[in-house]
């Protein structure tokens, strides 16, 4: 058994939150390039309207995904719950590379929103399972720090990647981060 396992668990959950925010913010950071390539006939107002529609679909899906994944985590536990949530959101992120317009982006963003929503009920459940009451606020604080760190690093990471790669490759690269996260999660967390 790994010494300090609960701290490994909360650390991995915090890293998942970092990845969550990078995947989520990639669309906004890359939108100018996406809009120019996929919607060259539209003006800036048209690009804003499409971006707004796709972003609204993401948020609506995310809101619905909170309750859905809360139930999933209660039903199957944190180990498999996180594997499903992060596995699906990573694949959904990579699928963005194959989007061709409003419909496909809306579908992939919706899938991303539903699956990314699992990170928060999963973190709450992991804290309750792995930490005594007197340490849960600290554990939640560590997880929340991951979310803040993800918001901080997302745009610089995406910006750096955009120097070397086009938007399609970047969605693949950032999607792979979540799949790589699954390796230590499935190895370390056994219940």
Language model feature labels by segment:
Residues 92-96, 112, 185:
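MFS-fold secondary transporters
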Residues 30-64:
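Extracellular/periplasmic helix-loop-helix junction of adjacent transmembrane segments
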């Amino acid at each position: 058994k790994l010494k300090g396992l609960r701290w490994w668990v909360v650390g991995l959950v915090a890293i998942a939150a970092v990845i969550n925010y990078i995947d989520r913010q990639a669309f906004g950071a890359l939108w100018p390039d996406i809009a120019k390539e996929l919607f060259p006939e539209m003006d800036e107002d048209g690009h804003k309207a499409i971006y707004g529609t796709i972003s609204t679909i993401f948020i609506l899906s995310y809101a619905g995904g909170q309750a859905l994944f809360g139930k999933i985590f209660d039903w199957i536990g944190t180990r498999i719950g996180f594997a499903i949530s992060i596995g699906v959101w990573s694949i959904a992120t990579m699928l963005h590379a194959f989007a061709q317009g409003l419909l496909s982006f809306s579908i992939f963003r919706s899938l991303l929103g539903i699956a990314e929503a699992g990170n928060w009920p999963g973190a709450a459940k992991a804290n309750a399972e792995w930490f005594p009451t007197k340490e849960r606020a600290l554990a939640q604080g560590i997880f929340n720090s991951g979310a803040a760190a993800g918001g901080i690093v997302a745009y610089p990471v995406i910006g750096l990647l955009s120097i070397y790669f086009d938007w399609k490759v970047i969605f693949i690269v950032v999607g792979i981060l979540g799949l790589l996260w699954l390796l230590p999660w499935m190895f370390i967390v056994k219940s």
